[in-house]
Every structure is written in C-alpha cells, then in structure tokens.
C-alpha cells in the first residue's frame, strides 16, 4: 500500500478479514483504505478489469478513433507503431493524424504502466507535417506519463516521426511474470489509474 492508493476493494469475506488483520498489525494508518465489496455486479465487471487484463497481452490495442497501436517488445527495445485505419476521404489528413497520435500517446502511457515495460522505447507516430502538431503530441505524451511512478525520459519526435524514450522498470514486465500458458496471478497486475 502507498499513500496514492485511494482504497483496496476485496470481494471475498475471508480474504477481506485476513487483509484487514494484516493491515491493522503492519500499517494501521491504511486500515480505512481496505473495503469489502458487496455489490451484486462482480468486482471485475464493475471496473472492467478483465478487459484491461486482456489488452495487456494483446500485441494490437485499439484506439477510440478506430486507429490502433502495435506493441512489439524485442531484446533491444520496445517498438510501438501507431496505425490509423480511419478513412481520410473528405477529412483533413493532418487533423486525423494529430487526433490519432494524441489518443495513442495516452494509451501508450497507460499500456507501459499496465505492462510495466522498461528500457528503450521507440514510438513510430503517424507522420505530421506541422511542427506544432509534433510538439502537441510530445506534450500529450509527457502529460500522460506524469502519473507514472517509474523514472521516464522522453525525447522529441524526429524528422522520421519517431519518438525515443526510456522508462525504468519497477518489477518484471507482465510478459515475464506470466507462466507458460497458465493463468496470470491477478495480484501481480499493476493496474493503471
């Protein structure tokens, strides 16, 4: 538990009692943050946790604009590509690229926290001609990363549309903690805010 955690909801009575007893003994100032979840709607359904877990293992993550990001971890770095599948006929191509890149910046920051990916990360944003659009995307990326507890360094978008960044890993990445073909222990998932 940390100061920035608002509350911990537990949907099993015996587990709730065990956790509450532990917190009372070890960190009593956090006792009021432990809550028993009693709603009829299952806890994971209420907060759409299953969907977040599913996206954490997918190579491609869809964006609200129908674009997507493709995340490829390699030995040397994490490569992230942004794709716009939105039709551009009748639309301003530059505006479509900007909006998709802004959405991608937020989702990338979320996915990096969720998967706890670290090291060198190279993001291939959709090409944008105006420098002001590039600065806007860089700023959105920095803002989206502000809540990350890991140490992060973000560069500028290059003339090739690439943004380099580094992120400190806080624990083994989600892909590394996953047992081969077995279920993922939910207690180890770093859920984003």
Features from the language model and the residues they span:
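OB-fold/S1-family RNA-binding modules
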Residues: 1-69, 74, 156-185, 193
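Conserved glycine-centered short motifs in functionally critical loops
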Residues: 63-185, 193
């Amino acid at each position: 538990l940390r100061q920035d955690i608002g509350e911990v909801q537990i949907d099993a009575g015996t587990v709730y009692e065990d956790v509450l007893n532990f917190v009372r003994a070890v960190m009593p100032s956090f006792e009021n943050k432990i809550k028993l979840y009693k709603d009829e709607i299952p806890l994971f359904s209420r907060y759409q946790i299953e969907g977040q877990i599913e996206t954490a293992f997918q190579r491609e993550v869809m964006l609200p604009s129908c674009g997507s990001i493709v995340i490829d971890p390699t030995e040397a770095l994490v490569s992230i590509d942004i794709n716009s599948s939105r039709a551009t006929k009748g639309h301003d191509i530059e505006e479509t690229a900007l909006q998709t890149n802004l959405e991608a910046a937020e989702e990338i920051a979320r996915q990096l926290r969720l998967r706890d990916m670290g090291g060198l990360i190279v993001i291939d944003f959709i090409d944008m001609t105006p420098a002001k659009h590039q600065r806007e995307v860089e700023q959105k990326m920095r803002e989206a990363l502000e809540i990350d507890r890991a140490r992060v360094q973000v560069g500028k978008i290059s003339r090739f549309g690439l943004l380099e960044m580094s992120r400190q890993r806080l624990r083994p990445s989600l892909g590394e903690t996953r047992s081969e073909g077995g279920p993922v222990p939910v207690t180890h998932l770093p859920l984003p805010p």
